[in-house]
Each structure stands twice: as structure tokens, then as C-alpha cells.
Design a protein with these regions (language model features):
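Asp-based, Mg2+/Mn2+-dependent phosphohydrolase catalytic module
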Residues: 1-6, 16-17, 30, 35, ...
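N-terminal helical cap/lid subdomain that shapes the substrate entry/recognition surface
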Residues: 2-109, 117
Length: 240
């Protein structure tokens, strides 16, 4: 196996949200004078998520409009009146702050090391247009030769279509690619289904019996970078 392209998931693989989404919302509501029970907020978010999933593909390039619908629904479910849209605008600004997204300590050095070995790097993410802003704010855009996300692909991992679009953009065949991600069903099974070699990022050691290559830290991928090009992955070295 001669690997040419290494694809990465983003959320909980390269970076993570901190604090949690619910906590970020609760903090915003508190700063604007609203006290909401976490369980009630959770229910409102779940209902708004259903709207988001149903409308996502209709709002390519128009995420501000979709988020306005999404946030308005949350406020309605919480019984909060926002007649002139001020709260919607404020919560969008709140979420645009880079501080909510944090890189794992080894992310940047690993991407640079793998890129230095001559591999093309790509992203395959269940995400929307906002991903491009997140990558830019985290100064990650420069590392990637291609970026593919579900809103524009009109498909979510583990569906084959999003992987196929990523391969097309990278001008790469499945046999020449690796996909690194933290979600077994979406990343591992999705990649394997079309012939891409998957690698599971298992930071919390929850999948010790996984039937795939498994790493606990992106640095383990860096250590195998030379083998990626010359011999492919060596399972005995990558697993326990």
C-alpha cells in the first residue's frame, strides 16, 4: 500500500469545543439575564437540531440565515421573546469567538510532520460552511490541500458520497488514502466501506477491542509517517 493522501476528521480529532455546547449556551443566556434549566435547554437544542438537519443542504453559502432560524427556534422553545432579532445577532457573535475551539497539543506539529513527509492532507468532516472560518481562526487552513464537508457534499459520513468527493478533489484512489477520525461508525466504517484505510483516534481508550488501526494520540501517526510512504501502515506497531 503506497499512501499518498491522509484525510482527517476535525471535531475531537484535530480540535474540540470547550466548554460543551450546552454550557456555552447557558453562559450566553446568563450574560443576557436569562436563567434556564439545563434540561429545558437540552430539549430546545434537540428540537432545533432536527430543523438544522432538515434544512442544512438548502443553505449552502447562507449559514447566517440558517443559524438565525436555528437560534430563533431555540429562543421560542425557551419562551424568550426576540422581536427585533437582537438576541439572534448577539448569540451568533457569541459563537463566532475563536476561544470556544481548542487544538489538541499535538495537532499542529503532527500535521506539519506528516506534510513534510510529502503527503497530501485533506479534511472529511460532517460540518457546514462555518468549518472554513474555524480552520482559519485556528490557523490550520494552510496545512490542507483539500477540504470536504457534508453541507456542500450533501452527504454525511459514513455515506460513501462524501468520501468519494474527497477522493476526487485529492485526485486519489481509495487504495492510496488513509482516513483518521475519532468516531467508529462515521469515520472507520465509512472509510472502510469504500476502500480507504481507517485509523481510529481513541484518546480515552474506549475501543481497545476495535478491529482497526488505533492510536491514542496524533503523535503516534507522526511516528509512522515514513512507513506510510514506503510500506504502508504496520498494524502490529499501531495497535496495542
Amino acid at each position: 500500500m503506497r499512501v499518498k493522501t491522509v484525510f482527517f476528521d476535525v471535531g475531537n480529532t484535530l480540535f474540540y469545543a470547550s466548554p460543551s455546547r450546552n454550557e456555552i449556551w447557558l453562559e450566553f443566556l446568563a450574560t443576557t439575564g436569562f436563567q434556564v434549566q439545563p434540561s429545558i435547554l437540552k430539549q430546545a437544542l434537540n428540537e432545533a437540531d432536527a430543523l438544522y438537519e432538515a434544512k442544512l443542504y438548502d443553505y449552502v453559502g447562507q449559514m447566517e440565515k440558517l443559524w438565525a432560524l436555528y437560534d430563533s427556534m431555540i429562543f421560542r422553545k425557551l419562551g424568550i421573546t426576540d422581536r427585533d432579532g437582537t438576541l439572534v445577532r448577539e448569540v451568533n457573535k457569541w459563537w463566532d469567538q475563536p476561544k470556544w475551539y481548542r487544538l489538541y497539543p499535538e495537532t499542529r506539529e503532527t500535521l506539519q510532520a506528516v506534510k513534510n513527509r510529502g503527503y497530501k492532507l485533506g479534511i472529511i468532516s460532517n460540518n457546514n460552511d462555518d468549518l472554513l472560518k474555524q480552520l482559519k481562526s485556528l490557523e490550520l487552513s494552510e496545512y490542507f490541500d483539500s477540504i470536504t464537508y457534508s453541507q456542500e457534499a450533501r452527504a454525511n459520513k459514513p455515506e460513501p458520497a462524501i468520501f468519494q468527493l474527497a477522493l476526487k478533489r485529492a485526485e486519489c484512489s481509495p487504495n492510496d488514502a488513509v482516513h483518521v477520525g475519532d468516531n467508529y461508525e462515521k469515520d472507520i466504517l465509512g472509510a472502510r466501506r469504500i476502500g480507504i484505510l481507517p485509523v481510529l483516534v481513541d484518546r480515552d481508550d474506549r475501543h481497545s477491542d476495535a478491529d482497526c488501526l488505533r492510536i491514542r494520540d496524533l503523535r503516534e501517526l507522526e511516528a509512522c509517517a515514513m512507513r506510510l510512504k514506503s510500506d504502508g501502515f504496520a498494524p502490529r506497531e499501531m495497535k496495542d
